């Protein structure tokens, strides 16, 4: 990652902030990948998605995609620092030093200060999964993106985060003018993992267009085939995209809209970002 410590901004309170890089530098600076207003980030022990709220793009200085990317970027940096400190500690209780929720709070505070110094507005959801050795997975969520753990031996989800809304189609979100904060509303789910378990994190474009049973069916077939994780993610995206583009299709989003008395039909056209990861034992580890 390119070091940008020599170029910083001041937020007026004497706090030195990292600067937003130029377009040419951005690819080398930010952790993760942007997909529309969504962003994703991944490593060998953590994965995460964020869904920038697109309505901000119609406002002056609104930038939904930047908010989602910054939240994941700073969360990844803080998480890596927590893991580094834990690994260098003499304590046997490694997990007590690692908190994806506190890392998200730190990211939220940094992103808020940085964007405010440039008068950039926006909000985003965030959904994260972090593996702490030997086999503890922490799922952390704010908003309507979701994380799931699928156990092939049982053919079902054994854990999941719940969607969070203020009201229909208005998720809890982090950023400009939102009362939500990670420590205030963040949801944490702890899972004891087994080898072969599959973790999925996805923005709402997936589960707004596919029912849980459809996703489980796809995952079951994929697990039996032994195919690559990337192929499963692509399969889920393509299936959700097909429903999203069908104005007469049946979808969970349509069902929820009808329950609210809204005459909405078909799928929900949206950015769709999915990460699929499999829990595997490292070589040489008992």
Label each residue range with its predicted role.
Residues 1-286:
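PP2C/PPM-type serine/threonine phosphatase catalytic domain
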């Amino acid at each position: 990652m390119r070091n940008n410590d020599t170029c910083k901004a001041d937020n007026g309170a004497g706090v030195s902030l990292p600067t937003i890089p130029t377009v040419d530098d951005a690819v080398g600076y930010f952790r993760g990948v942007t997909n529309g207003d969504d962003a994703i980030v991944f490593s060998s022990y953590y994965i995460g998605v964020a869904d920038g709220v697109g309505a901000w793009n119609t406002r002056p200085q609104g930038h939904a995609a930047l908010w989602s990317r910054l939240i994941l970027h700073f969360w990844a940096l803080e998480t890596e620092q927590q893991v580094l400190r834990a690994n260098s500690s003499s304590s046997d209780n490694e997990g007590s030093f690692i908190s994806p929720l506190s890392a998200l709070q730190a990211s939220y505070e940094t992103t808020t200060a940085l964007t405010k110094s440039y008068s950039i507005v926006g909000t985003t959801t965030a959904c994260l999964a972090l593996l702490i050795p030997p086999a503890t997975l922490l799922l952390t969520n704010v908003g309507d993106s979701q994380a799931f753990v699928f156990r092939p031996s049982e053919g079902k989800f054994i854990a999941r985060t719940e969607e969070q809304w203020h009201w229909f189609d208005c998720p809890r979100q982090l950023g400009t003018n939102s009362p939500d904060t990670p420590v205030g509303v963040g949801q944490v789910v702890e899972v004891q993992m087994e080898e072969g378990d599959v973790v999925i994190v996805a923005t709402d474009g997936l589960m707004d267009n596919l029912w849980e049973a459809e996703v489980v069916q796809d995952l079951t077939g994929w697990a039996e085939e032994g195919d690559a994780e990337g192929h499963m993610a692509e399969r889920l995206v393509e299936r959700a995209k097909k429903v999203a583009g069908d104005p007469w299709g049946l979808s969970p989003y349509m069902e929820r809209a009808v329950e609210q008395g809204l005459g909405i039909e078909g799928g929900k056209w949206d950015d769709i970002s999915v990460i699929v990861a499999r829990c595997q034992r490292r070589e040489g580890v008992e």
